């Protein structure tokens, strides 16, 4: 995102935009419940509550940002169609959101994308284009389609409406747990972390927001230390959902302002938390979500 667009986004009425996002999402995204975790509470000596977005529509929080973005578009824009690039949760979030809005969606995916993910995306009515060997090539093709055919590109994280959509998680936390003191969130591209931090700090700034990253994905640690986006040369982690080399420009600006602390976790801790959630809570949690749980140890 260009710097002028970042500055413009930072000047918007965050409280009003977050409330608007919540209103748009009513009837589409689930208000996921808060679940107490006795085992984590005993381990840490603090009351630990979980917000399982893996139980969200399409299986992840991504529907929130995707739908808020698409709901913000005019009918004329919708008529041109929606396009994005993703090999994971964002693809299904955009496909579902576009279907709800009555828009045609085209999702560009790498040719190596597992058939299960391709089929899951198609099931929501999207056209899937398999292009390129890696995600960057798919993303470049999606951008080309947007330019040539006038389609609207829905970014996975570097977009204000997407961020506000993810921020509705923070609003729900404040509503359901009015005495909350700390919120831990995993950082990948930064849309989720930026949205939650924006919501929490806008409405209850005394609450601490803590980011969590795998030790093999250092972009956020390096960027926050440098005071600017500092892409990682290599990313090695099982948590593919947060395995991002280049954090988003707008997410960085928001997280740099609002994040209280950053915790790095090991692959062993991530894997242990995946098993713990399955054994104690009967929740199937992907590695990216387990990153925030690992930060509690």
Descriptions of predicted regions:
Residues 1-297:
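PLP-dependent amino-acid enzyme catalytic core
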